[in-house]
Amino acid sequence: MGPVMPPSKKPEGTGISVSSQCYRSSTLSNPLQDDDDLDFPPPPVKIHKEKGGMEDEELTNLNWLHENKNLLKSFGDTVLRSVSPVQDIDDDTPPSPAQSDMPYDAKQNPNCKPPYSFSCLIFMAVEDSPTKRLPVKDIYNWILEHFPYFANAPTGWKNSVRHNLSLNKCFKKVDKDRSQSIGKGSLWCIDPEYRQNLIQALKKTPYHPYSHVFNTPPTSPQAYQSTSVPPLWPGSTFFKKNGALLQDPDIDAASAMMLLNSAHELQAGFSPGVIQNGARVLNRGIFPGVRPLPINPIGAMAASVRNGIANCRTRMESEPSCGSPLVSSDPKDDHNYSSAKSANKRSSSPSDSISSSADDHYEFAAKVCREGSDISFQSHESFSETEEEDKKQIKKELKEPLVESGYSSQHKKKQHLLKLRRIPSDALPLKKRRTEKPPESDDEEMKEAAGSLLHLAGIRSCLNNITNRTAKGQKEQKDKETTKN
């Protein structure tokens, strides 16, 4: 934009002076003249040549811009009107007399254009009707009746009215009743969300003779009673519905207020096991059904895992490696260290030590038959004094051939039971482990089981002898009969 020349100076060099027909009146103020210099469209001018020399060759000083502080206020109304939702869709409306100090009167000045926009005219027409809704032709008639200027005005104003009705958000179309006979077209009413905006726009005019429109009570449900309310805009916390001002949903408002009031409780009212950083924490007073999730500290969890791994290592070192799963030192790869604890609990109960299956009894009887004496059976079932003897004993059992195929599974069960009975003594020191002897109750139970098994074995041997004798007797009788024949 180049240097701006103040209005007090004349143009240089060309000798051309600009004089305006509209800006010579004494009623105009300096801000209007300043607006003419800010690249606004110039008024019609008359150009005539004068003889003049160059008065000043220096650049124009811009300090004169700070002298007038009301520069923006002079055209603030036009700027605000450009973003208002109630402005006219058609911008062909000339400046109205409302901008001057003279009041507007349609009866005294019938040829003067009214100071209202088309949206305000439509608003006044609809609000003046008893049903708060009008067709387009009735809006035309109301404007012509109250403002005689439009009787002789060009017909383009009707197009502006139709455009405002169809494109402006302040007006909406309503279905007509069957009882009404309005012909073609539809009824138009005021959108409740923008009614206050229309009222504010109408009150900006210095004089409007139809202020009684806003004081009359409405007679239909489409009318809206409250007028002394703050203007509505997108994002406001209030909205209108059937003439009443309502807040946003009560749940959101109540929860927000309670959260603000209980901020100190949220900071100090949690247990040390609740996650507070990086998580959304709720107050128990607001949400009684929601309970915080207790989280064990990381140090305690790591200590428990470390203890479990240490116990598994000691057990695996003290026990034979035959038939037992390998336990890794890494807790991620180890999935079996928890099974040893559960097996230990099962073996510690006396009922498990007393109860044994018939397969175990038969296996014990078979070992008695293989070894050939009761002493060997008892020495085999009793606990060894040292770990080396236990290892040798298990190796011997593995090398001995099994008579039947079912004995292999029973052999594994026996080894597992022996291993579980030995687990409680592993926690003791090595010297005590060597000197420790099995409890007397276990010895008595094993003796009783051995006696019952021997009794069963004797019964079986007796039955075998009887069957053999009967078979021999039958054979002898058959032989005698054959010899006689």
Curated annotation (Swiss-Prot):
In terms of CDD domains, this protein maps to: FH_FOXN3
Q: Which domain of life is it from?
A: Eukaryota
Which residue spans does the record list as DNA-binding?
113-209
Q: Where is this region: Disordered?
A: 1-54, 85-108, 316-357, 401-449
- Mind listing the GO biological process terms from this record? negative regulation of DNA-templated transcription; regulation of DNA-templated transcription
A family per Pfam: Forkhead
The UniProt entry's GO CC annotations, sorted and at most eight, read: nucleus
Q: What is its main location?
A: nucleus
Which InterPro entries does the entry mention? Answer: FH_FOXN3, Fork_head_dom, FOXN2/3-like, TF_fork_head_CS_2, WH-like_DNA-bd_sf, WH_DNA-bd_sf
Q: Sorted alphabetically, which keywords does the UniProt record give?
A: Cell cycle, DNA-binding, Nucleus, Repressor, Transcription, Transcription regulation
Could you give a GO molecular-function term held by this entry?
A: cis-regulatory region sequence-specific DNA binding
The record's listing under Gene3D superfamilies reads:
Winged helix-like DNA-binding domain superfamily/Winged helix DNA-binding domain
Q: Indicate, by first and last residue, each region the UniProt record lists as having compositional bias (Polar residues).
A: 16-30
Here the segments flagged for biased composition (Basic residues) are 410-422
Q: What is this protein called?
A: Forkhead box protein N3
The beginning of the lineage is:
Eukaryota, Metazoa, Chordata, Craniata, Vertebrata
Q: Which gene encodes it?
A: foxn3
